[in-house]
A protein has these predicted regions:
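Short, solvent-exposed loop/beta-turn-alpha elements that line the ligand-binding surface or hinge
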Residues: 1, 40, 64-69, 87-107, ...
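Hinge/lid segment of periplasmic solute-binding proteins
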Residues: 1-25, 40, 49, 77, ...
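C-terminal capping/gating helix-and-loop segments adjacent to ligand/active sites or protein-protein/ligand interfaces
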Residues: 10, 222-225, 243-293
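Short helices/loops that flank or line small-molecule/ion binding pockets
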Residues: 33-34, 53-57, 129-143, 278
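Extracytoplasmic/periplasmic substrate-recognition and gating elements
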Residues: 36-37, 116, 155-222
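Short helix-initiation/N-cap motifs at beta->coil->alpha
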Residues: 45-49, 122-136
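Glycine-centered hinge/linker elements that transmit conformational signals in sensory
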Residues: 52-54, 95-124
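Paired acidic/hydrophobic, glycine-rich loop segments that form the ligand-binding mouth/hinge
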Residues: 141-146, 163
Length: 295
């Protein structure tokens, strides 16, 4: 089991549920567009910005980079940039740290890509679905999206030469992906007289469910990613493109969605992004949000 996913079910040192399936976000890129521009796949922010510049010079009709700062998923954009700059929603103690220096730097970098003309023209209104359509049509060279994009592109009749990789991070920072997982949880019936038999049956079910081949086949059928390393390795043997997801799954971070203020934070970071797109100061916006949330 990938530790990052198992930790999402842990409260006060006790694991209360088992992750049964996962999804994650990674960077998709159009191989032909990057090749035509003569750029390597970017792994750092400096490389990303340089790649955007070359792509724009080579093919001005293509948006080098896709950004979604809409009310649909603007909080995801916040995570993509802040996590990959060593920041994020909370600090190492789990306290809100929305206006950290790293977060300010991260959002200024993202807004800078927009202001430099390297992104889709309307990030406040163009959702990730719009970006996926643009990517499929060859109008966006690179974007961050979920693991079901291949299915989305296939169902939409798109035919492009693309690949997936880790999200670019600032120099000196590790790449971090956004993870999502569902969980299985079994409740104990204290009134039942056959506790040992019930426990044995539950164990038998989990052994059956997480059998490597069976579990891997189930993930393929459902279109999700496995939460176990062994199933991921098994899938990677049969699908070279899946090998990229092993590194991505190991790097996942998650929204602090269990914190009571999360709904307000989610809406708040979207408003920060959209006001920053209009020219407001990122530091001031995040300071105000931090004060509203944490006092």
């Amino acid at each position: 089991m990938y530790p990052a996913f198992l930790e999402q079910s842990e409260i006060d040192g006790t694991v209360w549920a088992i992750p049964d399936l996962a999804s994650a976000r990674a960077m998709y890129y159009n191989k032909d567009i990057l090749d035509a521009a003569g750029v390597e796949v970017p792994t750092t922010w400096d490389e990303l910005k340089a790649a955007c510049e070359k792509i724009k010079e080579t093919n001005p009709d293509v948006y080098p980079w896709g950004i979604d700062m809409t009310t649909d998923e603007g909080q995801a954009a916040f995570s993509y940039y802040t996590w990959n700059n060593g920041g994020g929603f909370v600090d190492e103690n789990g306290d809100w740290a929305l206006n950290s220096d790293k977060n300010v730097e991260a959002l200024n970098f993202a807004i800078g890509l927009v202001n430099d003309g390297y992104t889709n023209s309307d990030p406040a209104n163009e959702t990730r679905y719009d970006l996926q359509d643009m990517f499929g049509a060859g109008k966006v060279a690179m974007m961050i999206g979920p693991n079901n994009i291949p299915t989305y592109l296939s169902d939409g009749g798109y035919d492009i030469n693309y690949d997936v990789t880790t999200i670019p991070a600032n120099e000196g920072c590790d790449s971090v992906a956004m993870g999502v997982c569902d969980r299985l949880e079994v409740f104990k019936d204290d009134s039942a007289e056959d506790q040992e038999a019930r426990t044995a049956a539950i164990s038998k079910f989990f052994d059956f469910f997480y059998d490597d081949e069976r579990y891997a086949d189930y993930m393929v059928f459902e279109g999700f990613l496995p939460t176990t390393q062994t199933a991921a390795d098994l899938l990677a043997k049969d699908d070279d493109t899946f090998a990229s997801w092993i590194d991505i799954l190991q790097s996942c971070n998650f929204y602090p969605a269990t914190k009571t203020e999360w709904a307000d934070v989610k809406q708040g970071v979207i408003e920060v992004e959209q006001n920053a797109l209009l020219g407001d100061d990122v530091q001031t916006l995040l300071d105000d949000l931090q004060a509203d949330i944490a006092g």
